[in-house]
UniProtKB/Swiss-Prot annotation:
Residues spanning the signal sequence: none
HAMAP family reported in the protein's UniProt record: Smg
Annotated gene: smg
UniProt source species: Methylibium petroleiphilum (strain ATCC BAA-1232 / LMG 22953 / PM1)
Protein name as catalogued: Protein Smg homolog
Pfam family, one: DUF494
Length: 150
């Protein structure tokens, strides 16, 4: 499913640029994605659109997010740490954070790998028609294993 999401991000500027589900499904199938993977991704994207509508409100700058035990188990320490990093860097506003958590909880298996969470964060930006800052974009695309430490 994550491969399909990355393909959509790389090939369509915004969700509005995507064709309807039926046509998009055919295109993705022609590119070589499996039907189950396509259906999972399209269903996940529908949930993302719903999350965008329901998490549009503002929260106080001093609000503190407390993760439920189920969220802690499903997301894992590394993913929660990454979300906190993005928040403290001022990149992820509270409504976007809630969208990320909502969509991460929609992934069946846990704990969620940070690499998968990065794709979710990228797709949240994409769904809102926003481009993350260049350094954050680099952080979302580059694996830690590929980094050179000076």
């Amino acid at each position: 499913m994550f491969d399909v999401l990355v393909y959509l991000y790389e090939n369509y500027w915004q969700p509005d640029a995507c064709p309807d589900h039926r046509q998009l499904s055919r295109k993705l199938s022609a590119v070589g994605f499996e039907n189950e993977e396509i259906e999972d991704a399209l269903s996940w994207l529908d949930g993302l659109a719903t999350a965008a509508e329901s998490h549009s409100g503002e929260q106080s700058a001093h609000a503190l997010r407390v993760y439920s035990p189920m969220e802690q188990e499903h997301l894992g320490e590394a993913s929660i740490g990454f979300v906190s990093f993005l928040e403290s860097a001022g990149v992820l506003r509270a409504p976007m954070r809630e969208m990320v958590i909502d969509r991460a909880m929609a992934i069946p298996a846990g704990p969620l790998a940070v690499e998968d969470l990065k794709i979710i964060v990228l797709m949240v930006f994409w769904s809102l028609g926003e481009e993350p800052d260049a350094l954050i974009l680099d952080e979302l695309f580059v694996d830690d294993e590929d980094r050179l430490i000076h």
